[in-house]
Amino acid sequence: MTSKEIYPLRSTGTMMMISDQDLKLSTQLMLRIAELLLEFDANHEQSSFDPIPILKRISELLEQATDIFIKNDPDPLDDRHPHRTHPDSALGNILKIIFKNDDFMTKLVVSYILARDNVELNIQGSRLLLACIPGLDSKVVFSEPDDFIPRLYTWAGSEGTNETLQGYAMGLLAAALENTENASKYRNENALLVPFGLRRLHELQGRSLEEQKKIGQTDFSQLHAEQSTSNGTSIPSIKITSVDGSTKENEKTFVQSTDPPPPKKRRTEPCLTSLLRTEITQRVPSFHNLRNLDDSNSKWDILQPFLIGDQQVYPLSLATYQRFILQYLAACGEYQDLLLQTFEGNALEILFDYIDLEKSKDVRLTFDALKYLTSLLVHRKFALEFVNKGGIPALLKVPKTSLASVGVVTCLYYIAYSNDVMEILCQMSDEIVDETVQYVLWCLEHSHESGMASACMFFSQGLFYKAILRRFDQYDGPRKLHNYIATLTLMQNNEDVELTEEQIHTSTQCTRGVCTTFRSYLTAHIFIKVENYKKLYGNNLPTGMRFPELVQGDCPDYKSMKPYEEVCWQCEAIVTEMLRFTGSSFREAENLRKLGMVRMFLAVRVLSRDWENISPSLRTEMCVHALETLCMMFCLPSIQTELITQHSYNHSNYDGFTILLQTSLGRYDEDPSLRMAALGCIQRCVYVEPECWKAIIQRVKSSEEKSSSASKRQSKYEIIMNHLERMWTEVRKTDGIMALVNLINCKIPLTEADSIRKTATNTLTGLARHPEVRQILAKLPLIAHNGLQNLMREPVCSDKRDIHAAFCKEAVQLLQVIYGRKIHDQQGKEIQSSEKSHRQWVIENTQVSFNQAELLQLIHDHLLKSKLDSVAAMLKSEAKLPDRPASRSINTPILNKPLPSSGNNFSKINDTYPTLAPRTLESEIGGISARRPSNAASLSSPAMATRSHSTDDDVFATPTLPRRYTTSGAFPKKLMISPARQKLRPLTPGESSSGYRPIKDLNSIVTDYFRNQHSTCKNPVTTCPPFSLFYQHKCPELSYQTNVVRNISLRTLDQELLRPHERVYSQWTNERTIFSRFRNWKTIHDHDESYTKATFSVDDEHLIVGLFNGEVHWINVDTGLDEGHTNCHGSALTNIEPSKDGSMMLTSSAFSRPLSALWRLGEALQRVHTYREDSCVKFANTTMQRIVGTCRDKATVYDTETNHVLDTYLSGIDGLQYEKNYASFSPDDKLIFNDGLLWDVRKKNSAIHVFDRLSKITLFGTFHPHGTQIVINSEVYDIRTFRMLHHVPELNRCQVSFNSTGNIMYATEVTDVHCPDYDEKIFSSFRTFETRDYSALTTFEGRRPVIDLCASHQDQKMCVIEKVRPQMSDYMIQASTQLKIVEIGRLKDNEDENDEEEDEQREDHDEDEDSDESGDGDDDEEIGGNSSDRESVFRTLGRLGDESDSGSSVDDNDTLDDLDFENAQNRIIRRQAQRRRQRLNSSENDAELPGSDEGSDEDGDDDEDGEGDPDFDMGAAIDDLVDAVDEEVDEDELGTDGDDDDSGSWRTTNSIDSEDINLDDLDEEEARVVENEGNNERPARPVDPIEAAAAARRAILGRGLRDLRMGIRGGNRRRNGGGLEQAEMLNARAEEQRVSFMEALVRGAEAERREEEGGDDGESSSSSSSDTDEYQSEEEEINSVSTTALNPALRRRNRRPDDEA
């Protein structure tokens, strides 16, 4: 045997690929079985059929296959189907063939085994069923018929007369009792049969001894020349007497004549390598001649019966009979109610005989006895008796290489679970304990899979005993345990090997056992280290930590350390801090690191996700134990660096921190305990206990003070700090801040959310020790917006209030670390907000100084009031006090800190007192806080209270500052008293207080007075002028001293008169005003393809638009015409960037190669260069000579002219994997930002900074045009200091761009253009932000998802690409995007609002304004008719009318929105006039015009004047209604006739000038006629009747409009069912506008009447002019409402010529 053992990879299968000879033999057996079953199927229904011969032959074949199966040494404890464990074995395939024949199996159980009066048939049936036991399901086979199991009890008990049938019944009952339901059901039968079985074993043992005496001792030296049919052994058999008295012997078949497999194959079995050990030959005396067989080729044939064994079922041998009884007893052994029968039957004595292989002479008999012993060892009483009677030495006598060793190690595994038994074992002699550990370790390496698993589980429990643990290390146990898992095929990175479900299952069982054992191993060593620390340091650890109360003394070697598991986490923390602080080693953890266990445990976590068909509980337990073991290894700081190393798992590389963070974030199917375990590993790497942190900071400061400038060697504590900074940095690189913040905010799972939140907060506290992390956290909403305080209000789960209290404690500590000061919680009731905490800190750290003379003046005044004039006069003369307040006098001393009293020693603290230890200090703070619910005071003296930057937690202490123990100062100051005085008993009311010092002096009282006064300031500051006792203190208010007016017009006029800083403020205010106003100007959707990208040309005259098909179009901004296009790519364009001089242009596409290209602009686009793999290319900012391209995580800089690669910047493993990574130059082209990394263009080897990723979905970063900031998602960083300046949640997932000055930023959340679905729930918008403080200016609400946004270079217009609902027809789908051009700096008018509402209500985009201008005939036909026009009017106006009373007056007409009504009407009027001109220009013949108005006039009325003018046809229904209203009001309400009504001045008021008529597209001649006719008649009317007529007209008109609306709504609802709410909103607006308009007409009519009564009759032209002026004043009053459709006076003028005719 070689000195170095080779451990082949294991797939947990014990049988390799069988040879051709074995395969041929297996095939013959299966064919023979198939023939016999066919013969049975053909004859079993005949009355003369005798099943016994067929049963015998099938049984013989099965027994032969079983012997072949046994010779291959399968796992004896693996009770799975042979076909599952060994798919190529003959036994498994034969069993499958038999079980498929349901008729045969039914006959076998029902007819043959239970046959009456046919013992031979019962025997052969039971024999066959016993041979089928390895593949049977006991729940199914033994469930029916009901009398099956009772018949077996009858045969097996004392009533049975046939021994063979009795033995077979025992074997079948053993299989039946594997089902616990049967065991409980037949409890009484078992109580009778167990004693009988034990007595039967005594009898059979005696018979076996007699048979052995007859045979004599076997001499192995004679076995060379012998060849027996039993493969080298003689087994005593029982003569079975049949019914006819003849003796039945075993019949030989053709199968038995085949030669056994060649021994060379068997010699390659793993157990053969250990057969050469001399210790084994010396163990068993009968094996003394084994060494003579070393050179024999037949060695395995000789040794097989003694190491593996075999069995003879028919004729039933004595050994097999005893085995069946032992198997039955093993099935009953674990039941407590049968333990009494076991003791009464003296089972222990029987077992001692059977486990001695020298006595049993059968290894399988010994193995079955060990199985019975294992079932009895679950009882503590039996286990104690077994060990006390020498059971351990008896077990160790079983040869390791034999089959029975599996049973031995299983017994030891059961013993390990009993503490009392293990204590006895550990107190045995060293030889026995040593041999036990060696025996189990040998089985761990060389046994079957079940034996290895039992050995592993023995150590998982036994390693808590120091006696076992010490020997486990001594005999190289960790390495052997590592080999146990490392040799598994499952743990290899080999995807070519496919494992079966059975192999995966058994491999995962092995992995779980190893992880559990290693966890116990390191836990025990940590407990031992804690005990050693307690011996060495007592109760005072150098780190300031305390020992758990449970760990008080040294645990003996024979006692278990398992009770320490309750304080395991505290012990781990102590060991971690001590190893970090002292720099000592952890040898056991270091050895595991050398073995590669860090990678192995991480592999368990990573690879377990791909292991299918294993239970979630098994996967969780396995991974939790692996990560908990890993966490214990991280107690040694040097091992923590292993998490930085990249490891390969299934062709993917991961570092440890990534694995742990992803696990802690968790998936929906992962257990919370697994997330907690992963989070605990991260916490171990980044967290430092507060006590240890203080000690480290003190040592660092002292070492820096002692170190000389010449000494360059780092101190031990500097190395500690460097290691911590490295860990903090690595966690940040793997998105640690984002992950921890998300875990703190998580609320699922409900039961464990509080625990996860607590651990995450503790981990974030450790990470916040890093100053950059602290600065980032201070800007995040968790801290800045009091998110953490909100979480502290109540627990997630109401049953976890104790855990929530621990979380609140951790949260307070986190706030203290971030703020750098003590945070008190007002007796735990309410944690202060960040603003209040900062305010309090300012007040506490304000240096209080006051005038000493003023204090003496107050004392002087008090003496005068107390009638002590002489004392007051003496004080005034001695102190030279002025007559006025000293603060108003000069040359008065200022007291910067309290002065000591000359008469009392207690007013000054003795600095020679020793400073309190940190723990004593905390107890002092806790006591004061408990008595006084206030927030801080100095513990040392009033002088120390003025030192502002000294806190209790030296989180941010620098090495140059001395150590100060202070608190924050809101509670009254308490003098620092020596430890001896602290023990004094408090005074009682009756005791004298002359010997005690007062708590405060006068200076402290005055200081507190001033500090309380300072706390009332609105904006307190730390640096204040001297306080005065006579005048109220007040900090200066924040003032914005500027004379800039708010009015933008006045501000523009005064621009030249402003001061420089006022001009800056004015410019800032102007930009805020301009970029907070936007107005829709034009909408374009003239192309069939979708728009994907847009940008303005250099001169802002054209819009360069990219389409989905890869075309680039040049659209004129003013006209909206497409002036040219070029096909640039084969897929959607994702980026278009023209150069600054307009000579070149870069384009990028989605997926077609080349992805990007450079174009030269001229008369046509000319492609210059292509960039095949770069998904985005951009020009440099200061020059056109360089281009940066992005290919995944690589940024490449090209030369523009030559297209040569200048530099390449690869982010690699440090990249943050942005969702859209587009590299870009900084404004000065000195920096490049790519995938979260900032590069210096002069140094491409390493990035200068890696930004933290704080959001799961992050777009590319954008440099600020000023060159000092960069915007990454919702964070704004200063690229000079890399500090986070702002956190703007509104910028999350937004694409940002800047205006020309860089002072304004646009942001919008873009939608993926490749997504074909239109989500109506997505309503996108863009916002504008001011880049000074990134406050939002305005939000331009959009009703559709935004794909892209761009702004012109002159900041006049913007272009937004919106995704609209696609319109489908029979043959095509219209464009699903549109271009919306927005004007900057202009308010949105009502027409824009109506357009948006109209677009939402209709589904057909052909009705839009730009489509109508195209002159499509279909559009003319659709909109030309009266019915369609009338429908459009009411749809636009929201269906005029209101369900409320139309006659109700409007209280405040100034609040009405007049523009909606006017613009909606004028827009329709203009469109109809435009169509009229188009029809007139297209043809001279009116009859040939398409879309005639007459054909579409639904009301049947001809157009007025017969001209077919559509300007008024659209309101025909409203005209008729208004006419009826006029007549009804005149005749009924006012009592006048119709003629007067037609010629009334209020109706024909001349308030519409020629411009308004031209606005409605009337001919000038018609307008002039209308005006002249309107001036002919002006009858006078009283004022009151006119106002009454107006009120009546409003009421009747409102009712009529409602009726008209209700009549039309039914037809419109079918087209506009989704827009009813918008229509109702417009109803109210339209009604209010109508009322206002009618009242304006009444006021105009009244003014005209009064003018005529005054006698002022001028000419028609002058009257027209004056009337026009009047109307202009009225127009201002009613907000320019000039709607023709609702102007009854104007309609009267147009109809009057027809009436007169």
Swiss-Prot record:
Cited InterPro entries: ARM-like (IPR011989), ARM-type_fold (IPR016024), LisH (IPR006594), VPRBP/DCAF1 (IPR033270), WD40/YVTN_repeat-like_dom_sf (IPR015943), WD40_repeat_dom_sf (IPR036322)
Domain of life: Eukaryota
Organism, scientific name: Caenorhabditis elegans
WD repeat residues: 1086-1125, 1128-1169, 1171-1210, 1215-1252
Compositional bias per record (Basic and acidic residues), positions renumbered to this chain: 1567-1581
Primary localization class, coarse: nucleus
Known function: Component of the cul4-rbx1-ddb1-dcaf1 E3 ubiquitin-protein ligase complex, dcaf1 may function as the substrate recognition module within this complex.
PROSITE patterns with a match to the protein in the record: LISH (PS50896)
Subunit: Component of the cul4-rbx1-ddb1-dcaf1 E3 ubiquitin-protein ligase complex.
Domain named LisH: residues: 851-883
Domain notes: The DWD boxes are required for interaction with ddb1.
Name this polypeptide is given: DDB1- and CUL4-associated factor homolog 1
Locus of motif DWD box 1: 1237-1245
Native organism taxonomy: Eukaryota, Metazoa, Ecdysozoa, Nematoda, Chromadorea
Composition bias type Polar residues, residue spans: 224-245, 888-906
Keyword Repeat: yes
Residues spanned by motif DWD box 2: 1275-1282
